């Protein structure tokens, strides 16, 4: 193909993958992003029915299936998903972009562990506060603890009607997280082919991170289901990549 041997094509692919990750990977590792406007995002989420006026994004974890490894099978196995996998944590905003991505971690790790290891709590405490000191918050599923900058659904078997309504309203708006994951797999289908995702033989984590970066670029150019739902445009591609 293209006058090149298969091993040579693989080397070229991996070099490009590494270059993209080296040059732009920082765009997914901290919240120092010029396009990040928590007040505008919170208003957009509130207008779609959220009972929270200060919620600007949604956090969730995803487990990407991998081929059963020869080594460390127990570490890579998720008892909840009943498969071998690597896990990522992402934070998605109403303009359809993944603004923070952490991973990969071993499949046995819990979402709360990923949150602690990611350093996101420190980033939120540093960046996401109003002028009067009140916090902007993000919302996640029940796996996440309630903290100053993170909220999750009410838990328990005997919830009040108000608590049930809160959970239902937030569930309706936080589906954008699943749309974000779905778009990555839609455009990079090979990531969903677990038999070819071989830890120690392929850069499985780097593949997913670069795919997320490229999907963000696609959203900047063409929008997404999330941008249409919240009516919030993504930044220009040049603004996103240059972060200025």
Please state what every model-predicted region is.
Residues 1-244:
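Short, well-ordered secondary-structure "scaffold" segments embedded in the functional core
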